[in-house]
């Protein structure tokens, strides 16, 4: 099972090595604006799942939002520590 740190390490590796066909690479290439639009979309899906769907569906949507937030962090050059210091 992945956690926040292992996901970030995996995404960082993909950003560095840029494997062909990687969804992460494609999203990074879409830029901050494209990634931001995806974050907003996923946040709305989290809300709708939490409001109207099962706990399992809400958890899945939350995991997708966390993925896109981490891609945004990578695009901005932010580390986990940059974010953790604000928690």
Curated annotation (Swiss-Prot):
Signal peptide from the UniProt entry: none
UniProt entry keywords in alphabetical sequence: Amino-acid biosynthesis, ATP-binding, Cytoplasm, Histidine biosynthesis, Hydrolase, Nucleotide-binding
EC id: 3.6.1.31
Pathway(s) the chain acts in: Amino-acid biosynthesis; L-histidine biosynthesis; L-histidine from 5-phospho-alpha-D-ribose 1-diphosphate: step 2/9
Short name of one Pfam family: PRA-PH
Recorded coiled-coil stretches: none
Catalytically driven reaction(s): 1-(5-phospho-beta-D-ribosyl)-ATP + H2O = 1-(5-phospho-beta-D-ribosyl)-5'-AMP + diphosphate + H(+)
Protein name: Phosphoribosyl-ATP pyrophosphatase
């Amino acid at each position: 099972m992945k956690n926040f740190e292992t996901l970030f390490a995996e995404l960082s590796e993909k950003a560095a090595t840029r494997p062909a066909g990687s969804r992460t690479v494609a999203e990074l290439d879409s830029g901050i604006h494209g990634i931001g639009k995806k974050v907003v979309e996923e946040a709305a899906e989290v809300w709708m799942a939490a409001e109207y769907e099962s706990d399992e569906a809400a958890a899945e949507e939350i995991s997708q939002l966390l993925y896109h937030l981490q891609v945004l962090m990578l695009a901005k050059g932010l580390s986990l520590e940059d974010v953790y210091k604000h928690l």
